[in-house]
């Protein structure tokens, strides 16, 4: 008996981009894992339910070394969705897939509410690319605990406070017109010029271009004060505003 197909409906396959945290281990790996443990201990839940890409381009790993690293991360409940900087031949069944060419992209159109000036001409990008404008996303209300605001295209401004357990992730700078009690990550896609500004600093975690500082690292003199933070020689610097 021959089955006749009278309804030929296609299967829709969509391409979509998501913002993920990228972990870039450094040698020696044991010491890097200790620093990762320190971050996880001082910022509980940072990796919980968060997509993570493992970039091993700075390491010289064989297949066994890669498996050991993945096992060490699984023990720490860090779920790896993909691996960057690895030869496809090193990927075995059951391992996360090999990724390459990651770049920011938006799945949801966000209306730009402000446009900043062009980047200075005397500081061109090494790749020769020219970013014409930097967009800004303005949140006109406080950010509640458990909320996560991600805007890789540019700056994020919050007219209000950011509660403990909430987070702001921006490709550019972060401006908080209120108390910053949660997490703020600026320059998330690689922007050493990004800054963090807030009217009251009580943050759980701060990060600029991948360099982080947790609550215990903040100078007591700056707690509860209006503060700006910036990156200098791979170190986060902070100063009181006004």
Swiss-Prot record:
Cell division inhibitor that blocks the formation of polar Z ring septums. Rapidly oscillates between the poles of the cell to destabilize FtsZ filaments that have formed before they mature into polar Z rings. Prevents FtsZ polymerization. Signal peptide: none annotated. It comes from Agrobacterium fabrum (strain C58 / ATCC 33970) (Agrobacterium tumefaciens (strain C58)). GO terms for biological process: cell morphogenesis; division septum assembly; regulation of cell division; regulation of cell septum assembly. HAMAP family: MinC. The gene is minC. Keywords: Cell cycle, Cell division, Septation. Belongs to the MinC family. This is Probable septum site-determining protein MinC. Interacts with MinD and FtsZ. NCBIfam families: minC.
